[in-house]
């Protein structure tokens, strides 16, 4: 017999807020008593399709619910992507074209099943019902809410006070997201804490449209990125992508602070609350070294997107390069046909910097090495020969000037 209390404790792990906990417990119990599945919705606008660990906080919890009777309704907001979620934005977002949306949606589908059970997942597109809503339906939807309530949102309030334009279409976004819940008739909706206004809209519209059930809500914290300060974001560069190579996933995870490690354990690890507490106590007592705890976390995260053997290989590679100070075995190789090349251009050519300006910054920061020797001369020229270029601790390239 399933231990419902233990399952609910596992579901609560790392959660920021649950609305209608009793309903979720009833759904779980009904599954084990009667075999009745329930539906979990999470929406993703395909504006930036490459998933990173921040996205997996919600996806991991959905994968857990799949083990206890949940059918995930993975909603790709191809229609709402034409508006763009205004949450946290200080200006109106650029509208994406259909071709870009379709391409990004395909990328999502390729990546999400690294985490979710495909056999218990329904991929849905909100254009299915929103594109046929029509003017009458849109007017009816818009009449369910008022501008004063919309302006309760912090981002809209700030923009209104600063006289920054707010498009009418942006007011429609939370309404359309809420209507998704009406159309999908989900039992649970999931999202980050920054989505609370939009998530509550689904409950409100469920009552308005009388769909017969009110969705419960599970809100997850926003994952703090590698810098230990800001939420994980591609634009800030403090992220780990789920499709990155295993060596980078392992090494980047090891780079986080000891303090942040425990937050990541709670939000990204499959360990139970008790297991994490015991590990933390062991570290505090000096029985387990913090580096060992962090290595175990890095192994678990890397294995989730690859497998345990590949994760172990990534650890061996890290030890080889960083502990034994040996060169990585999988360096990319480049060749330049010239008598000599400026070091700044060489770094850009080999992909070790995104621009000449960034290459100069790396050199000034003492982050560039040639053949494992630091350099500070940004005017340096490389003549014919072979060189090992390095930026920072983890990025290498082999360059042959011929």
Where are these regions (language model features)?
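Divalent-metal (Mg2+/Mn2+/Ca2+)-assisted nucleotide/phosphate chemistry catalytic cores
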Residues: 15, 97-219, 224-226
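N-terminal catalytic cores of NTP/NDP-binding nucleotidyl/phosphoryl-transfer enzymes
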Residues: 26-85, 190-196
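Buried hydrophobic packing segments
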Residues: 58-62, 175, 198-206, 301, ...
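A charged helix-plus-loop insertion that forms the helical arch/lid used to bind
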Residues: 86-102
């Amino acid at each position: 017999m399933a231990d419902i209390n233990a399952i609910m404790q596992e579901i609560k792990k790392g959660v920021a807020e649950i609305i209608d906990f009793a309903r979720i417990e009833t759904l779980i119990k009904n599954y084990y008593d009667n075999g009745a599945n329930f539906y979990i919705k999470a929406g993703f606008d395909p504006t930036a399709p490459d998933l990173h660990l921040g996205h997996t906080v919600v996806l991991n919890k959905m994968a857990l619910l799949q083990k206890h009777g949940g059918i995930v309704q993975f909603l790709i907001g191809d229609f709402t992507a034409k508006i763009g979620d205004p949450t946290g934005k200080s200006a109106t977002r650029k509208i994406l074209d259909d071709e870009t949306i379709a391409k990004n949606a395909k990328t999502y589908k390729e990546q999400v099943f690294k985490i979710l059970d495909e056999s218990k997942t329904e991929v849905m597109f909100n254009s299915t019902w929103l594109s046929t809503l029509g003017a009458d339906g849109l007017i009816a939807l818009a009449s369910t809410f008022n501008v004063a309530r919309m302006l309760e949102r912090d981002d809209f309030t700030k923009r209104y006070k600063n006289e920054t334009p707010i498009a009418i279409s942006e007011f429609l976004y939370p309404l359309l997201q809420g209507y998704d819940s009406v159309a999908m008739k989900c039992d649970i909706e999931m999202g980050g804490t920054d989505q609370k206004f939009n998530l509550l809209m689904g409950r409100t519209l469920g009552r308005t449209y009388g769909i017969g059930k009110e969705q419960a809500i599970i809100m997850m914290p926003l994952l703090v990125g590698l810098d230990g300060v800001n939420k994980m974001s591609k634009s800030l560069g403090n992220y780990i992508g789920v499709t990155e190579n295993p060596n980078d996933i392992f090494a980047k995870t090891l780079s986080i602070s000891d303090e942040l490690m425990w937050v990541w354990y709670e939000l990204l690890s499959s360990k139970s609350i008790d297991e994490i507490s015991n590990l933390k106590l062991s570290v505090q007592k000096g029985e387990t070294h913090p580096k060992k705890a962090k290595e175990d976390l890095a192994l678990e995260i890397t294995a989730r997107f690859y497998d345990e053997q590949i994760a172990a290989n990534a650890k061996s590679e890290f030890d080889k390069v960083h502990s034994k100070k040996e060169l990585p075995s999988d360096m990319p190789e480049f060749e330049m046909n010239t008598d000599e090349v400026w070091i700044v251009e060489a770094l850009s050519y080999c992909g070790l910097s995104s621009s000449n300006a960034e290459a100069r910054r790396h050199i000034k920061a003492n982050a560039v090495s040639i053949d494992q020797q630091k350099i500070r001369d940004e005017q340096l020229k490389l003549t014919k020969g072979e060189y090992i270029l390095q930026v920072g601790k983890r990025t290498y390239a082999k360059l042959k000037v011929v």
